[in-house]
Curated annotation (Swiss-Prot):
Signal peptide: 1-21
Subunit-structure text: The Tol-Pal system is composed of five core proteins: the inner membrane proteins TolA, TolQ and TolR, the periplasmic protein TolB and the outer membrane protein Pal. They form a network linking the inner and outer membranes and the peptidoglycan layer.
Role according to the record: Part of the Tol-Pal system, which plays a role in outer membrane invagination during cell division and is important for maintaining outer membrane integrity. TolB occupies a key intermediary position in the Tol-Pal system because it communicates directly with both membrane-embedded components, Pal in the outer membrane and TolA in the inner membrane.
Compartmental location: Periplasm
NCBIfam families: propeller_TolB
Keywords for this protein: Cell cycle, Cell division, Periplasm, Signal
Keyword Cell cycle carried by entry: yes
Family: Belongs to the TolB family.
Organism the protein comes from: Shigella boydii serotype 4 (strain Sb227)
Official protein name in the record: Tol-Pal system protein TolB
A single Gene Ontology CC term: periplasmic space
Length: 430
């Protein structure tokens, strides 16, 4: 956790910009299909009220994953503070085989100890499946809760948790001198801060694989330009500002390259920059429009959108040469793909019969599953563990963010109150 805290510390510099209403997760459907689990309010060992509801954070994280259905607090058969106090039979009677208990203790130096135990109610009393403790300052209490959630989630599912991740997105506010803002928040909408404000549109944020930088599109020079901004100090590097269109940046998984789309020669085509040398090479060529690159895990192949066949479809190409290969065949058009970190599937915007939804395609079998049921869905971005997708959709006269699990069972919204929200991008593990 110490290493993760050092990485996340860079974000603290920007917290002074937290001036706006934050997005919050509103669950629409799918909780009941998750695995039942007990999450007990963490026992507070200090005076007055606890400074943070750590148990509530853990319960919300597990619920938001779509894989768990935490028992409502009003139905908890007991509220133990330690593994030894858990009565297995009381929980087993409710169909619950795992319970999270914990403690929060203030220290004389102003810090806090946060401890949790994951208890197996199917074993002997006090059987602990996982446990840990963290010493943190007050501003890191939510982070400690997310850390406990990650460990519990991984122990019970075998999948690395992604609750300490963040999302970047663009908000078009309701007026003001700088109506366009690039913001970053925790994955659940908390701890939001502004990375950049502009009087001109901002588009397409993309995370570097170490989570320290964001690439995005700005129009502040009078035309589109690609820039990379370092989050810790705000430093901005201009990557491309060619005539016509510069857009759709995507960092390679190994962090050495940036793919993007340019139309400096007419049609949109894909280019890749070596970030160390600044050298740019063209990947696609021809009269078709090729855009929206996303990397495969090998950092050598791209999936991208092309109208080579007339309507937009997703293709694959090696950055070192070779003809593009079409990989989407279902639906009237498919675009804006995001390939999973293991390369086994991708999510994309799929249109068919006048509907535009987020779909998942198995890259081995070609099988497609429609995940979303919202309106005019756009710009899907996968969580680093591949269990959830964040995307934007139209609601009323504006745009909002939505979450859907990659099995399609869990759906939630992240409504904002101060503008339209677009171009979500899920961070890597932090």
């Amino acid at each position: 956790m110490k290493q993760a805290l050092r990485v996340a510390f860079g974000f603290l510099i920007l917290w002074a910009s937290v001036l706006h209403a934050e997005v919050r997760i509103v669950i629409d459907s799918g909780v009941d299909s998750g695995r039942p689990i007990g999450v007990v309010p963490f026992q507070w060992a200090g005076p007055g009220a606890a400074p943070e509801d750590i148990g509530g954070i853990v319960a919300a994280d597990l619920r938001n994953s779509g894989k768990f259905n935490p028992l409502d607090r009003a139905r908890l058969p007991q509220q133990p503070g330690s593994a030894q106090e858990v009565q297995p039979s009381a929980w087993s009677a409710l169909g619950i085989d795992a319970v999270v208990v914990g403690q929060v203790t203030p220290n004389p130096d102003g810090s806090y100890n946060v401890a949790y135990q994951l208890v197996d109610t199917g074993g002997a009393p006090g059987t602990v499946l996982a446990q840990n403790s963290y010493k943190v300052n007050k501003q890191w209490l939510r982070y400690a809760g997310h850390t406990a959630s990650d460990e519990v989630f991984e122990k019970l599912t075998g999948i690395k948790g992604a609750f300490r991740t963040r999302i970047a997105y663009v908000v078009q506010t309701n007026g003001g001198q700088f109506p366009y803002e690039l913001r970053v928040s925790d994955y659940d909408g908390y701890n939001q801060f502004v990375v950049h404000r502009s009087p001109h549109p901002l588009m397409s944020p993309a995370w570097s694989p170490d989570g320290s930088k964001l690439a995005y599109v700005t129009f502040e020079s009078g035309r589109s330009a690609l820039v990379i901004q370092t989050l810790a100090n705000g430093a901005v590097r201009q990557v491309a500002s060619f005539p016509r269109h510069n857009g759709a940046p995507a960092f390679s998984p190994d962090g050495s390259k940036l793919a993007f789309a340019l139309s400096k020669t007419g049609s949109l085509n894909l280019y890749v920059m070596d970030l160390a040398s600044g050298q740019i090479r063209q990947v696609t060529d021809g009269r078709s429009n090729n855009t929206e690159p996303t990397w495969f895990p090998d950092s050598q192949n791209l999936a991208f959108t092309s109208d080579l066949a007339g309507r937009p479809q997703v293709y694959k190409v090696n950055i070192n040469g070779g003809a593009p290969q079409r990989i989407t065949w279902e639906g009237s058009q498919n675009q804006d793909a995001d390939v999973s970190s293991d390369g086994k599937f991708m999510v994309m915007v799929s249109s068919n019969g006048g509907q535009q939804h987020i779909a998942k395609q198995d890259l081995a079998t070609g099988g497609v599953q429609v995940l979303s049921s919202t309106f005019l869905d756009e710009t899907p971005s996968l969580a680093p563990n591949g269990t959830m997708v964040i995307y934007s959709s139209s609601q009323g006269m504006g745009s909002v963010l939505n979450l859907v699990s990659t099995d399609g069972r869990f759906k939630a919204r992240l409504p904002a109150t101060d503008g339209q929200v677009k171009f979500p991008a899920w961070s890597p593990y932090l």
